[in-house]
Amino acid sequence: MVLDTGPLLAALDAADPDHPRCAALLTDAAEDLVVPALVLAELDYWCARRLSADAWLIFLDDVVAGAYRVESPTTIDLSRCRELQDRYRDLSLGLVDASIIALAERLGEPKVATLDQRHFRAVRPAHVAAFELMP
């Protein structure tokens, strides 16, 4: 499953209304939890704004311990991001969301964990008819 920033942030924030279902999704997942490298940067930013440095460091400890698999974008992924951002210009699809889509396509992964229903329901991935959005 490829992870967007929203579920990760909600899982770290006990006050977030989506915390219970996002924390359960990450805790109970049987499959690999894949985090695009650009999501790491966005999560660091939002932890600093909404939570604390401790929240980010706890998450980073989990990454280092192997709870998550981090994937950097390839040149081909970035080319696909450019295609997606051009095609879905009316959605204002950002680079982070485009990189999640490109990575899911590259890995052949149908599941995306996101709280961003708008973008991920509108985009038609190349490898499946539609993403299976979690939670």
Predicted regions and their residues:
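Histidine- and aromatic-rich ligand-binding microenvironments
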Residues: 1-4, 35-36, 93-94, 116, ...
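Alpha-helix/helix-capping structural signal
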Residues: 6-7, 38, 76, 118
